[in-house]
Amino acid sequence: MYKRQVENLGIQRRLIEETACIHVYPYGAITVGEQGEALSDLEGMAPGVVGFSDDGRGVQSDDLMRQAMLRAKALGKPIVAHCEVNSLLRGGYIHDGDYAKAHGHRGICSESEWGQIARDLQLVKETGCAYHVCHVSAKESVALIRKAKAEGLDVTCETGPHYLVMDDSDLQEDGRFKMNPPLRGKEDREALIHGILDGTIDMIATDHAPHSAEEKSRGLEKSAFGIVGIETAFPILYTCLVKPGILSLNKLLELLCVNSRRRFGLPLGTDYSIWDLNAAYAIDPKDFLSKGRATPFAGRQVSGKCIATICDGKLVYAAPETHTAK
C-alpha cells in the first residue's frame, strides 16, 4: 500500500516534468486514498511534496490528525487542511442562510468549517506543527485564525476570489454558483475582506475545480461542487478590490503570488506574467483555455488582461492578439 503511494507520486512528478509548462508542486495525501482511515506514508513522500493534504476532505479523526501533525512536524512539512465536519453537513449544498431558507434548499452551516478549524488549532498547540487552512469562507473561521496567530501558532490560511466579491445574496438557481465551501453571507464576506487587509488571511487561492458543462448543468442541488478560477482570479480581484481602492495592487500580488512561495519554501525564480491593466472586457467562458468553463462571473465587466506568461525565463503563453511575439 505504502509502496504504491510513493510510486504514484513518482509517476505524477514525471508527468509534471514532461508535460507542464509552468512549475507544479504536489501535496502528499494525509490519509491513504484520502479516505480518512489510515495515515499515508508521509516519510516516503516527503522528499517530493511541499506539504500534506487530503484535498477536498476533512480528516474526521482527532487521533489521526494529531499523529499526522506530529509526523509532518518531524519532517518539516505543513499540514494543509480542507476543514469540514461531515456530521454537520446533513446533505446541504449551499450556505445555510437567507437564500437557502427562502428557496427551500438544504444549507451547509458555517460550523461545519470553523468547528474543525477550532479542533485543528488545538492540535497545533499540542504538536507545534505548521498548519495551513484552505479556502476559508466563514467569519468565525477568520476570528479563530486571528486569535491563533496572536498566540504565536504557526498558522496560515487562504480564501478564494469568489468569497471576497460574492455572497449568498448573489446566488442563482444555477450550478455555476455551487462550490465547497459555499458562498456565505454578507457578514462573512466583509470579515474575509477585513482578514486580507489586517494580515489574518495570508493568501488568495483560486480553488480551481473544473467540471464538464453537463456536471454543472443540474441546478444547485444536483450539480457537482466546484468553480473554475485560474483565468478570472486576477481580473475579478483587480476590478472589485484594487480599482475601488479597497486593496493596493502590491498587496494583491502578495496575496496571489508572494506569500504562498514564502509559506511553502518555493523559489521566486524568473516566473512572471505581463498584464494590460487598462484592457476592459466582459468575461466570456468561451475564451477560457481551461476545459472547465462554468463560472458565476460569465458576462462580468472587468479590467486586466494577461498578455504573456514567462516561466524560467521562457515565454510559455502569449495572448492571441500577441501570438506573433512568440
At which residue positions do the language-model features occur?
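His/Asp/Glu-enriched, well-ordered alpha-helical/loop segment
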Residues: 102-130, 195-198, 202-204, 209-277
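Active-site beta->alpha loop and helix N-cap motifs at the rims of alpha/beta catalytic domains
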Residues: 28-35
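Divalent metal-coordination and catalytic microenvironments
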Residues: 24, 52, 82, 131, ...
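C-terminal cap of metal-dependent C-N hydrolases
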Residues: 219-222, 270-326
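Alpha-helix termination/capping residues and helix-transition junctions
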Residues: 18-21, 46, 128, 198, ...
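Alpha-helix-loop-beta-strand connector modules within alpha/beta enzyme cores
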Residues: 6-26, 70-81, 230-236
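Short, small-residue-biased leader/transition segments that mark boundaries at the very start
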Residues: 1-2
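Histidine/acidic residue-rich metal-binding segments in metalloenzymes
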Residues: 11, 38-204
